[in-house]
A protein has these predicted regions:
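C-terminal, well-structured catalytic/ligand-binding subdomain of enzymes
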Residues: 2-118, 147-156, 160-399
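Gly/Pro-rich turn-and-neighbor structural signature
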Residues: 123-158
Length: 399
């Protein structure tokens, strides 16, 4: 049944009904409160009420540390979100097992460590990593601008995450910072129990934000890696946009998505990840701004989904903002994110500043209104990392 359900067209049509059921079932449910906490290989601290988790060491050590730090929130989220959204846990577990052989050994070690320390166990933890490939359930909007398109010239990447909260996920957003032993440090925005990343940035100043693309059920498969893991690997293994594009062109994924890339060298690319091809559109000094939502743009790769109506409307807003010629700054990007937020499911807004190695996040109840942003500074993400010289010059010249 799970396999048949995954192959059915237009899964997005079932989401409003699931949201309504969960709103009733989760009435009064609350995520356990976040609090400062330490583990042998990590710590959780609150920055202006935003949970920021650091884990370090081997994959198993990082998994165990994360499980110890957010296990309580993870168990609640699995119970009131994953099992509520998709009650056929047994069927979904069979699909997750199909994806398991394609997972890197190190990632499986991390899942095992996380499952043991969080109290979920390995199988439930594995299901969490495959959940978003089995159940496509997010809509997003992104915009990147740099050089002549921004007031200071620095590169900025803004993203909306529109994701059904089911009355609980909005309270579970967190920042995770990975410090793997002897390797590149990277960070991202996620939820407890989800070890992959949908948005993030590494210490080399490479940032990304992904968007699901609907309408391609016939070509999608399970013979690949979960897309949140793929994007986490981009941040772990690549230092700039060029390297990220080369990695994505190997097509390790099995679900159609778009991704916006930006690096502190003021390079950006919109990459449309079709099953047959990664379609790359790069920015340039002559084209210093790009926008993207939830559909493919190239003829021959498009396919209808009911999300197309919202996706094209949001893309139109972003493109008109670019075409206006008005330069972008952080406040203008925030205003655009508010304008393109989807009612009832907008739970995260993020502005990445790769040259400063920092970002601003706004989490909370679904809303299309204004949000309060919290800056997660370089010192909290990547201690002792160095921002770009171009950013220092641009910022020092501001009036």
């Amino acid at each position: 049944m799970a396999r048949l359900r995954k192959q059915l067209p237009f899964p997005e049509l079932g989401v409003p009904w699931k949201m309504l059921k969960a709103r009733i079932a989760n009435f009064g449910q609350k995520l356990p409160a976040w609090r400062d906490k330490r583990a042998e290989h990590g710590e959780l601290r609150l920055i202006d009420d935003v949970p920021v988790v650091h884990v370090r060491g081997t994959p198993q050590q990082m998994g165990r540390a994360l499980g110890e730090l957010v296990g309580e929130q993870t168990r609640k989220l699995y119970d009131r979100y994953i099992h509520m959204f998709a009650p056929d846990v047994k069927g979904d577990m069979l699909l997750a097992r199909e994806m398991e052989p394609r997972l890197p050994a190190a990632f499986k070690e991390e899942i095992r460590g996380f499952g043991e320390a969080s109290g979920l166990g390995y199988e439930q933890a594995l299901l969490g990593q495959c959940f978003l490939d089995i159940h496509k359930v997010a809509l997003c909007s992104t915009l990147v601008a740099h050089d002549s398109a921004t007031t200071t010239g620095e590169i900025l990447l803004g993203r909306n995450l529109d994701f059904p909260s089911l009355s609980i996920a909005h309270a579970a957003s967190m920042v995770i910072c990975y410090e793997p032993e002897g390797q590149r440090r990277y960070s991202g925005i996620t939820w407890p129990g989800f070890l992959g990343l949908l948005s993030g940035m590494n210490e080399d100043g490479l940032a990304l934000a992904m968007m699901l693309v609907y309408g391609h059920k016939r070509s999608e498969h399970l013979d690949g890696q979960p897309f949140p893991l793929v994007f986490r690997r981009v941040l772990a293994e690549c230092s700039n946009v060029n390297e990220a594009v080369k990695f994505l062109e190997t097509r390790p994924y099995c679900t159609t998505t778009n991704v916006m890339l930006a690096d502190k060298g003021r390079h950006a690319a919109r990459v449309q990840l079709h099953m047959k091809k990664a379609i790359v559109d790069r920015s340039s000094p002559e084209k210093p701004a790009l926008a993207c939502t939830n559909h493919f743009l190239e003829k021959g790769y498009r396919s209808f989904a009911f999300t197309w109506f919202s996706s094209t409307l949001r893309l139109g807003h972003l493109r008109r903002a670019i075409a206006s010629g008005v330069k972008f700054d952080v406040d203008r990007i925030k205003a655009l994110l508010q304008k393109t937020a989807i009612p009832a499911i907008n739970i995260q807004r993020i502005v990445f500043k790769p040259e400063r190695l920092e970002y601003e996040v706004a989490f909370g109840h679904p809303t299309t209104g204004k949000r309060r942003y919290v800056t997660i500074p370089r010192e909290a993400l990547f201690a002792q990392a160095t921002p770009s010289q171009a950013a220092e010059v641009a910022l020092s010249s501001r009036p």
